[in-house]
Each structure stands twice: as structure tokens, then as C-alpha cells.
């Protein structure tokens, strides 16, 4: 019986010793995160689409914190670019390409009659906007879809296509540059 208690005590002592060594190593070799990259990463839409040329939002956030252009996030568009410009205290930049300058929001559409239920699109979707079960038809939740286009390529039956979102009163945005409104500041009015 004493051999059992000796084994328990020895294993407990080893566990405590290794825990202390790991705790010390974690504090001694801690890698400090860039706080600017953290803030930039919080602003990005986290769609992990790769349209910016980086494999995900975190690598792009680190690149932006190191001086990369702030206008490469296609899913975030102008809103994200303006937030990044404000955070980094830099001038807003025009969006990356002419197609991105006037983005037409697109969402994935699945032709449910041709869907074989392989779930490859579900696995490819970074924001879980596609629902369905194995060997059953799938559908896209358009409110969640970011239009990243990552679900189209894996589809073996080519039943997924990107379609532009119809402009309605719910998603239409005023072009404030074309409206001739003069802003009157309170100090000038009084």
C-alpha cells in the first residue's frame, strides 16, 4: 500500500514541477500581440475570404498595422476602409479597383433542384451562411452571406452562382454627394 502512495506522491510532484516549468516558460517567452493589429482585426468583417490577397482577416490586419493599404477589404467595402482610416489616423483611400469602387453586393444562390447535398459548400463557407444536410438540398441565408464567392468552386454540380442583391428600401443608401444640402454648424446659426 505504501508503494501506491509513493507512486501517487511522485506523480503529483512531477505534475507540479512540470506545471511550474510550463508556467514560467509561458511568462518568460510570451509573445506580445500588436495592439493596433488587434484593433484592426476587430474592425474587419472576419469573412476570411482572401479577396485582399491575404489568407484571412488576421494576416491582413497585421499587414495593415505594418503600413499596408487599408482599401483591400472587398466584403467590408467603404465602411471598413473609413473605420480603418480613422483608427490609423491616415487619409481614406479609394477602394482597390473600379469594381470595388461601386460594389454591387452579391450573395450566393443555390439551384436547389440540382443540389446533390454533398455539403462541400457548407464546409467552404467561412460565415456559415449555407444550411442543409447530407444528401438533402442546401440553401443560403442571404442576410449572413458576405458574397466572398468561396462556395462556388467546390460545388461538383455547378449549382451555385453569385447573384446581385436587389436594391430595396431596406438596403438602399443615399449618395450624399449628389444631394445639395448645406450643413449649418450650431456656432454659425446662433
UniProtKB/Swiss-Prot annotation:
This is Ion-translocating oxidoreductase complex subunit B. [4Fe-4S] cluster 3 binds at residues 125, 145, 148, 151. PROSITE patterns: 4FE4S (PS51656), 4FE4S_FER_1 (PS00198), 4FE4S_FER_2 (PS51379). Residues 1-26 are annotated as: Hydrophobic. GO terms for molecular function: 4 iron, 4 sulfur cluster binding; electron transfer activity; metal ion binding. Binds 3 [4Fe-4S] clusters. SUPFAM superfamilies: 4Fe-4S ferredoxins. The keyword 4Fe-4S applies. Its cofactor is [4Fe-4S] cluster. Part of a membrane-bound complex that couples electron transfer with translocation of ions across the membrane. The complex is composed of six subunits: RnfA, RnfB, RnfC, RnfD, RnfE and RnfG. One of its GO terms (cellular component) is plasma membrane. [4Fe-4S] cluster 1 binds at residues 49, 52, 57, 73. InterPro entries: 4Fe-4S_dom, 4Fe4S_Fe-S-bd, 4Fe4S_Fe_S_CS, 4Fe4S_Ferredoxin_RnfB, Elect_transpt_cplx_RnfB/RsxB, RnfB/RsxB_Proteobac. Residues 106-135, 136-165 form the 4Fe-4S ferredoxin-type domain. [4Fe-4S] cluster 2 binds at residues 115, 118, 121, 155. The keyword Transport applies. Its EC number is 7.-.-.-. It is found in: Cell inner membrane. Belongs to the 4Fe4S bacterial-type ferredoxin family. RnfB subfamily. It comes from the Bacteria.
Amino acid at each position: 500500500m505504501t508503494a501506491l502512495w509513493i507512486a501517487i506522491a511522485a506523480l503529483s510532484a512531477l505534475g507540479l514541477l512540470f506545471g511550474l516549468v510550463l508556467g514560467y516558460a509561458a511568462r518568460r517567452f510570451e509573445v506580445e500581440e500588436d495592439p493596433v493589429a488587434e484593433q484592426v482585426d476587430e474592425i474587419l468583417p472576419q469573412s476570411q475570404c482572401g479577396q485582399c490577397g491575404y489568407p484571412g482577416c488576421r494576416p491582413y490586419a497585421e499587414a495593415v498595422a505594418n503600413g499596408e493599404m487599408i482599401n483591400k477589404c472587398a466584403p467590408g467595402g467603404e465602411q471598413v476602409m473609413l473605420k480603418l482610416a480613422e483608427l490609423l489616423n491616415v487619409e481614406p483611400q479609394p477602394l482597390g479597383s473600379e469594381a470595388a469602387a461601386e460594389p454591387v453586393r452579391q450573395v450566393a444562390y443555390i439551384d436547389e433542384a440540382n443540389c446533390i447535398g454533398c455539403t462541400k459548400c457548407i464546409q467552404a463557407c467561412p460565415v456559415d451562411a449555407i444550411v442543409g444536410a447530407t444528401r438533402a438540398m442546401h440553401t443560403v441565408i442571404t442576410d449572413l452571406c458576405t458574397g466572398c464567392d468561396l462556395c462556388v468552386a467546390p460545388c461538383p454540380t455547378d449549382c451555385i452562382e453569385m447573384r446581385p442583391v436587389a436594391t430595396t428600401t431596406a438596403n438602399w443608401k443615399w449618395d450624399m454627394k449628389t444631394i445639395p444640402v448645406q450643413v449649418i454648424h450650431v456656432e454659425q446659426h446662433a
